Each structure stands twice: as C-alpha cells, then as structure tokens.
Amino acid sequence: MSTATTFPVTQLELAAISGGELLRFPISFAEYWDLLEKAEYRIDYYEHEAIAMSYENEAHSEMVTEFSHLLKGIFPRTDLQYKVHNSNRPIYIQECDQVVFSPDGSVVTQPPVYFEYRPGMTAETTPFLVFEVLSKSTRKYDLGEKLPCYKKIPGLQYILYIDLERPSVTVYERQGAHSWMDVEYTNLEAAFDIQGHTLRLQDIYLNVF
C-alpha cells in the first residue's frame, strides 16, 4: 500500500477529511512508521489503526508550551536524570501490543532507551511523566483508550490531564506496580507536587481563567 497516495500527509489534507475531529484509519505497523516520517501532524498507532490529531488551536498550543515550561523548571537541562520532550517524541508501549502514542508532552528518564523501528526512526520507552491537554475532540480517546495503556508502562510515575474548558488538572500517581492514585484539582488556589516541587493551578492557567 502506498503511503503517499493512500493516507493524508499534510495538515490541509487531514483537515479536509477530518472536520477537526480525530481521524482513524486501518494501517499496518510498517505503514505507520512510513507515514510518521512524512506526516505534518501528530499521529498515534493503536490497535492496528492510525489515529491522526487535527490541527491544534491556539489555546491548546499555548497550554502545552506553558506547561512544558513549568516542567523544565522542575527538570532543568542540568538534571541529567530526566529530559522534557514535546509531542514530537513518540512513546512506544510494548506492554500494550505495540502501541505508539505522541502525548502533548513527556519527561523521559535518562539515559534514553529507544525502540528503533529502523535507523533514524525511534520512540521513547522510558517516560517518567506524560501529560495530555484535554479538548472536545480528544477527551474520550485520551481518557478511555490512552490512559489504560499509559498505566502499563513500568517506569511511568505520573500521568497528568489538563482540561482546556475549565480549571481542572487530574494527576495520576503510581503507588505500586499495579496501583495508581488519582486526584482532580479544580480550584485555582489548589496545588500539587511533582518530585517535591509544587505546581499551582493559577500558574498552569495563567491568563486562561
């Protein structure tokens, strides 16, 4: 099957057929990596489907940028144990049947351990933290399908969901090999800790609410 003629490659091609919603289409693992190399948009691989993310609106993009900045205050470049990544770095989850997700952002344990599909095409396998910014088009997918797979990553300690429509941050923190604690914070005065560092909702939602 030819990636160039079968699957949308540009943002305009995707927008023309997706209507701003998630677009799913059957794809093989090999075809996924071919498409990932060419596509102008974020794309996941889940249950033998490509799941394409439509163009990010400004509010979503700003939230991802600002929260990544806050994470870099906790995990600076001088910290050789961790590295903050944006959505350009996919995460391979072997424990969930060869799933590949591109979270809005992640913190990856260093030195990195890569899944290498072929030279130059790699995915992270050792995330310490992942976060997703929830929107109308991705909420069901992020919480219903991605979350159970994220929980299967052995070294993952934190999963964060940041709501764009209202002040709400849900923090999943690993308690044991197969147990998680989740707490939702909805007050702008609320705060929570990541690695002993305090994050406040009023900083996360600065100039938003």
Region annotations inferred by a language model:
Residues 1-209:
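Gly/Pro/Ser/Thr-rich low-complexity, intrinsically disordered segments predominantly at protein N-termini
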